[in-house]
Amino acid sequence: MMKIGVSTLFFWEYPMVEIFDIFRDIGIKCMEFFPENPDFWDNRFDLDYIADLRKEFLKFDVALHNPHIELNPSSLNPYVREAVIKETLWSIELAKFYRCKLITIHPGKRPTNRSPTDEEYEAFFKYLDRTLEVAINKNITICVENMPERINRIGWSPEEMEWILKRYDELLYMTLDFAHAKEYMEEFLESVIDYIKHTHISGVVNRKDHFPLRKSEIDFSPYIKALLDYGYNGMFNLELDDRRLEKNPVTKEEKIEEVIKDIEFLESII
């Protein structure tokens, strides 16, 4: 059976308790939780708030997305790298508390518009070494996400993702972002399908990501079917961006309608 989830970040402007209600009303049983949702982020050090949400999280199948805004695990600035490690270790503890079995992380990038150097890769590998050491002890699976194709990004090509994953074989896994992959989807499935434990899915319009899936100019349905046929039993997580919709602001009811239509579209594929 296809497991369909939705990113909490699509409903970023609402309190977490309201997001839980929205998901329940729609009938969603899976979610990808972004701690950087403003309501949660503003209360992240309030232990009573954190504890009160636990009973709600336990009602869902939850994957966690590591904080990434303003962060870069491949930074050559040691203070930035230290911040990334602190946030990641905090996320691992949070995932354990909320019984999330999986965390998605981003690879790094070179801050200038040039190809990453050996130093950026080395910084990223040191970050992975520390992250995996802690996560494995906590029985948390770490999945690195493929990035959009940019000259300064680590991990956008199938070849590079395969190289990274094989370096940490049986320790590190992958979150496959369909919209980031675009025309490389077939190559990703050919080279790293055994590592895929989680997915992000959305539509691509004019080469831009995170549109409603049903409006995508790239037909991802063959790859969805291929994953399912291969035995993939992870989440297909809708990662939509309200800025890609045709109006601003977008009401809660309009967002709910977009999610319902995309869920129906996904279900129609199989």
Swiss-Prot record:
<protein>
    <recommendedName>
        <fullName>Uncharacterized protein MJ1188</fullName>
    </recommendedName>
</protein>
<dbReference type="InterPro" id="IPR036237">
    <property type="entry name" value="Xyl_isomerase-like_sf"/>
</dbReference>
<dbReference type="InterPro" id="IPR050312">
    <property type="entry name" value="IolE/XylAMocC-like"/>
</dbReference>
<dbReference type="InterPro" id="IPR013022">
    <property type="entry name" value="Xyl_isomerase-like_TIM-brl"/>
</dbReference>
<dbReference type="Pfam" id="PF01261">
    <property type="entry name" value="AP_endonuc_2"/>
</dbReference>
